[in-house]
């Protein structure tokens, strides 16, 4: 097992792992230890009351955070005709069909999000082995396969996050940067939790959101008291 650095030991010593912190206090703790030479991301882990082994209980979707994520996504759009012009006008970084597919096959993937109109899936479908492992394959469940590509581009550019539970039923995503104000981080977290509650599977029983923890890129997790949200 790797030894803890002095910084990580100090962080762990400053966080009570048995306590669920009031949200403003939790954010203050994160900011206190966010001392990396770069602006750290603020990540969240949400433990859900689901059985991830059952396909009808898996949670997947997307939501736009009110204050964004602190970074602007590069967006590639597979579409043609009027939709291509609309995508460009909405701010898409790359737009095309077979020509864009050829770039992807060559490993030229300078983008963070891939959007496709339904008629373009015949082209995108051939890229599954390349885009799939990177989590870039367009999917109607998260709004990246849509006839309204312009709206999807605007959402991606304005701070939309995608989420999907892992094999343990936990959602991992980002809610901003360490230099966001406490209110911005709180409102982003509230928006995410509201989206998750809305996406609750009808077959999930009992407490749905069981635990919420936030952390910075280089920091320890801090449990959040949900009553403070």
From Swiss-Prot:
Biological process (GO), any one: translation
Instruction: Give this protein's Gene Ontology molecular function annotations.
Output: rRNA binding; structural constituent of ribosome; tRNA binding
What are the disulfide bonds?
Answer: none
For this protein, the record's InterPro entries field holds:
Ribosom_uL1_bac-type, Ribosomal_uL1, Ribosomal_uL1-like, Ribosomal_uL1/biogenesis, Ribosomal_uL1_3-a/b-sand, Ribosomal_uL1_CS
Among CDD domains, the record links this protein to: Ribosomal_L1 (cd00403)
Q: Does the UniProt entry include the keyword rRNA-binding? A: yes
Q: Name one Pfam family in it.
A: Ribosomal_L1
The keyword Nucleotide-binding appears for this protein:
no
- From what superkingdom does this record's organism come? Bacteria
Identify the keywords attached in UniProt to this record, alphabetized.
Answer: Repressor, Ribonucleoprotein, Ribosomal protein, RNA-binding, rRNA-binding, Translation regulation, tRNA-binding
Report the GO terms under cellular component. Answer: cytosolic large ribosomal subunit
- Record-linked SUPFAM superfamilies: Ribosomal protein L1 (SSF56808)
Q: Which PANTHER family does the entry link to?
A: 54S RIBOSOMAL PROTEIN L1, MITOCHONDRIAL, LARGE RIBOSOMAL SUBUNIT PROTEIN UL1M
Subunit comment: Part of the 50S ribosomal subunit.
User: Belongs to which family?
Assistant: Belongs to the universal ribosomal protein uL1 family.
The record's function comment reads: Binds directly to 23S rRNA. The L1 stalk is quite mobile in the ribosome, and is involved in E site tRNA release. Protein L1 is also a translational repressor protein, it controls the translation of the L11 operon by binding to its mRNA.
Q: What is this protein called?
A: Large ribosomal subunit protein uL1
The lineage is: Bacteria, Pseudomonadati, Pseudomonadota, Gammaproteobacteria, Pasteurellales
Q: Which gene encodes it?
A: rplA
